[in-house]
């Protein structure tokens, strides 16, 4: 890596940890180790890509999710690796000063900056429900989009309207794509989306000058290419007909499938179960006992009832799955379980460090169960 390492070292990140981060991002997108090196070269380039982040009708959840990411200290890495020219929440200035800075950035970096929009855009009553500096937010967004090298809709609200567009939709909220017809908008839905999906997308744009492969809804396929149901840890219980019927019942306590509690995993695409959140094992809704509510999918999240049954798109049981009757520990060695975790982890696109932690935790759990 011949790029400038000053940024990395200034935040207490050594080269090894930084390369692990780049390798994890590449693995998340299903890319090779060569791609990891190319990403490392690009993101340490002193010519940082300018980013303009505009918030519309949003709750700031996407920003909070990004700032609380760790892999390691992604919040610092992102804010220093890119040149964040405008972000209302994170700006030290306010009022006329910050608006002037935004307009200067739009002119200075025309054709070079990445435009990120967070939140739905209200169109009813000429857009008066979200105003900035005396102008409807839709006008700010359209102006910024004219000179953008890439456009990203982050979060479900920006990707397809989200909660603001549900029900009677009093503000006439729409998605970013609807106000920018004819432009390619990269959608990264989620409420909030996993910050590493956003980071990996930006890293791909920085490295290759183009978006990653997108699906028919303009979502990166590395993150939204498979049904959550297909790689959920509770899927074996679904195949075996074991379902929790009420919160707190035996099935719920035993970790059985949450389909009958309204889990939308069978009709929602995402990598929630494999990437999880903030490098903490088991941190995603289903793992902590709550059904997925389909926030990644238009017409499902915020539209279907939380406990309304999902449409099962693929009812064929997986050909290879663990036995739901197997007891933890048993005759399977901790080393074998750690090795299995490593194989599954590589396939799922998680980091090597996460896999090692899985193996260490499994050994500890087995030792505890034996009373050692």
Curated annotation (Swiss-Prot):
Enzyme class at the top of the EC tree: oxidoreductase
Membrane-topology descriptor: Peripheral membrane protein
Post-translational modification: Exported by the Tat system. The position of the signal peptide cleavage has been experimentally proven. Can also be exported by the Sec system.
Residues that bind [4Fe-4S] cluster 1: 59, 62, 157, 191
GO biological process, one term: anaerobic respiration
Co-factor binding comment: Binds 2 [4Fe-4S] clusters. Binds 1 [3Fe-4S] cluster.
Residues reported to bind [3Fe-4S] cluster: 272, 292, 295
Enzyme Commission number(s): 1.12.99.6
Cofactors (names): [4Fe-4S] cluster; [3Fe-4S] cluster
Primary location class: membrane
Family to which the UniProt record says this protein belongs: Belongs to the [NiFe]/[NiFeSe] hydrogenase small subunit family.
NCBIfam families: hydA, PRK10468.1, TAT_signal_seq
Oligomer and partners: Heterodimer of a large and a small subunit.
Entry function: This is one of three E.coli hydrogenases synthesized in response to different physiological conditions. HYD2 is involved in hydrogen uptake.
Name used for this protein in its record: Hydrogenase-2 small chain
Organism per entry: Escherichia coli (strain K12)
């Amino acid at each position: 890596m011949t790029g400038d390492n000053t940024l990395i070292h200034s935040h207490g990140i050594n080269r090894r940890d930084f390369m692990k981060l780049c390798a994890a991002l590449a693995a998340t997108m299903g890319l090779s180790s060569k791609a990891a090196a190319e990403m490392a070269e690009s993101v340490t380039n002193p010519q940082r890509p300018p980013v303009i982040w505009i918030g519309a009708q949003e709750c700031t959840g996407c920003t909070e999710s990004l700032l609380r990411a760790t892999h390691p200290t992604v919040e610092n890495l992102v804010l220093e690796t890119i040149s964040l020219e405008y972000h209302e929440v994170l700006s030290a200035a306010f009022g006329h000063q910050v608006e002037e800075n935004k307009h200067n950035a739009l002119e200075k970096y025309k054709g070079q900056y990445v435009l990120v929009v967070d939140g739905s855009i209200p169109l009813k009553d000429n857009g008066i429900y979200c105003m900035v500096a005396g102008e409807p937010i839709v006008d700010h967004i359209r102006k910024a989009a004219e000179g953008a090298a890439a456009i990203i809709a982050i979060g479900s609200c920006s990707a397809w309207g989200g909660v603001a567009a549900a029900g009677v939709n009093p503000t006439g909220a729409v998605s970013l794509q609807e106000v920018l017809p004819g432009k390619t908008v990269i959608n990264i839905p989620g409420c909030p989306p996993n910050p590493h999906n956003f980071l990996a997308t930006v890293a791909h744009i920085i490295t290759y000058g183009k978006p990653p492969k997108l699906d028919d809804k303009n979502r990166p396929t590395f993150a939204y290419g498979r049904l959550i149901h297909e790689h959920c840890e509770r899927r074996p219980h679904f195949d075996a007909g074991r379902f929790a019927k009420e919160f707190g019942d035996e099935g719920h306590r035993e970790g059985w499938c949450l389909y009958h509690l309204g889990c939308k995993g069978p009709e929602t695409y995402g990598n929630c179960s494999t990437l999880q959140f903030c490098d903490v094992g088991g941190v995603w809704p289903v793992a902590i006992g709550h059904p997925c509510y389909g926030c990644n999918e238009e017409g499902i999240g915020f539209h279907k009832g939380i406990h309304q049954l999902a449409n099962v798109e693929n009812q064929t049981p997986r050909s290879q799955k663990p036995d739901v009757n197997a007891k933890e520990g048993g005759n399977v060695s901790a080393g074998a379980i750690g090795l299995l975790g490593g194989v599954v982890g590589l396939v799922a696109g998680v980091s090597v460090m996460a896999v090692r932690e899985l193996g260490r935790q499994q050994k500890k759990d087995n030792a505890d169960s034996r009373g050692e």
